[in-house]
Design a protein with these regions (language model features):
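TRNA-binding/sensing appendages of the translation machinery
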Residues: 1-73, 131
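Histidine/cysteine-enriched polar flanking segments
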Residues: 2-10, 53-55, 167, 260-261, ...
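Positively charged, Gly/Ser-enriched RNA/tRNA-binding surfaces
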Residues: 17-28, 40-41, 72-84, 94-147, ...
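A structural signal for short, well-ordered beta-strand segments and their strand-loop junctions
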Residues: 33-36, 92-94, 151-156, 251-252
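Beta-rich nucleic-acid/ligand-interaction surfaces
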Residues: 36-54, 153-164, 256-265, 363-369
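Acidic, His- and aromatic-enriched active-site or binding-groove loops in soluble protein domains
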Residues: 55-61, 169-194, 272-274
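Extended alpha-helical scaffolds
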Residues: 144-163, 167-179, 193
Length: 383
């Protein structure tokens, strides 16, 4: 089963408008466009364990290659080869399709094609590069003008919190504890051979989420003072005024972990709630280990970024793109055709969209029909 994208013209216009708006924001922040390959080396994806092997779409003609399941790995590989000598930090943006394989009906495999846009910030020697990335994400979504009565929630965590949890309570059963915490599975947690006091603490942590400083206070009671929590507190104190300015609610969820095994450090999702439906419109995080994997000699192996779901945003923007001025050029007598051709060239030189009807037209009703059929906003008669 394949979820093939076949867009109508309105959806195509919406996609183009969303991507154009996002690209304009990225450029203002000093980012440059890259176009990573759609085809990946399957061993690279498997070697980093970025995604489960059964979710990868391999090529029939060459089982060593696959369609990219995400953008970041391709871009990090690119900067370790083609862009290895370019000065850091690298600020890169990209648009394109990714391809997923998911479980379908009766164990069938469902192939999905998705449109993404995003940025990557590589080699920025600063303690909190997340501030720039998060600021750009908020700015990007703000420029898109979402529908009224939508609520935005910025869900944040760090893989370091899970490390704290497992270090204190994990004993020799870290993997199953981690799985139950991520899945919010109390039943599985109950089956683990673990001290009852530890189980009680883990259940408390499992459902600890909300306003960042309140959550950090609770975490401090569990783990004591820690640099990890101090750094988180500083990050939230910095981005809170920014999120308030954009009307975005921030929540810290210690057990949140992304599906892709890319990230180590800060991870996040931007969720939009509209009419009781939730849409993940962006996700991202920090992936220093991925940078080190592809280039062990990287001086500042710092990498982070985000991807935005164009497919979900298309459902949430206020309206389609505003209709641009589009002129239909008509003439009544064939002797005026040359003049009409020259007029079209003049309009094009002014960056005005114009369509020339090559057949003479003498009937105003037909003229109106031609205007509507061509999607034009006005008629210019050549006399």
């Amino acid at each position: 089963m394949t979820d093939i994208k076949e867009f109508n013209l309105l959806d195509v216009r919406k996609n183009s408008q969303i991507i154009k708006t996002l690209n304009e924001v990225y450029k203002l922040w000093g980012y440059e466009e890259v176009t990573p390959s759609t085809i990946n080396d399957i061993d690279t994806i498997k070697g980093r364990e970025v995604i489960n092997e059964d979710e990868i779409i391999s090529l029939v003609s060459n089982k060593k290659l696959c369609l990219r399941p995400e953008m970041t790995t391709s871009i990090i590989k690119l900067i370790s080869t083609r862009l290895i000598n370019k000065k850091r930090p690298l600020r890169l943006w990209n648009n394109g399709n990714i391809f997923e394989r998911k479980e379908g009906y009766k164990n069938s495999k469902k192939l999905k094609e998705k449109i993404q846009s995003g940025i990557e910030l590589i080699g920025y020697d600063t303690k909190f590069p997340e501030i720039e990335i998060i600021n750009i994400l908020f700015d990007s979504i703000d420029k898109l003008k979402l529908k009224e009565n939508t609520k935005l929630i910025f869900l944040v965590s760090t893989t370091s919190i899970m490390d704290l949890i497992l270090k204190k309570y994990g004993s020799n059963q870290s993997e199953i504890i981690k799985k139950s915490m991520i899945n919010l599975d109390q039943d599985e947690l109950n089956t683990i051979n673990l001290d009852e006091g530890f189980k009680y603490a883990l259940k408390q942590l499992m459902f600890t989420r909300g306003e960042p400083n309140e959550v950090i206070t609770k975490l401090t009671k569990h783990f004591g003072k820690s640099q990890i929590l101090d750094d988180l507190s500083f990050l939230f104190d910095t981005i809170k005024p920014i999120s308030d300015n954009y009307g975005i609610d921030i929540q810290l969820d210690p057990t949140f972990q992304p599906h892709l095994n890319l990230y180590a450090g800060i991870v996040f999702q931007l969720i939009c709630i509209n009419k009781d439906e939730k849409y993940v419109i962006a996700k991202g995080g920090r992936y220093d280990e991925l940078v080190k994997y592809f280039n062990p000699n990287e001086k500042n192996p710092i990498g982070l970024g985000f991807s935005i779901s164009i497919d979900n945003l298309r459902k949430l923007i206020k309206t389609g793109p505003k209709m641009e001025r589009k002129i239909l050029i008509l003439y009544k007598n064939k002797e005026l055709l040359s003049k009409a051709i020259n007029e079209q060239k003049r309009l094009h030189s002014l960056n005005l969209i114009s369509i020339l009807e090559l057949n003479p037209c003498k009937n105003t009703e037909i003229a109106e029909l031609l205007k509507n059929n061509n999607g034009c906003s006005e008629i210019l008669w050549i006399k």
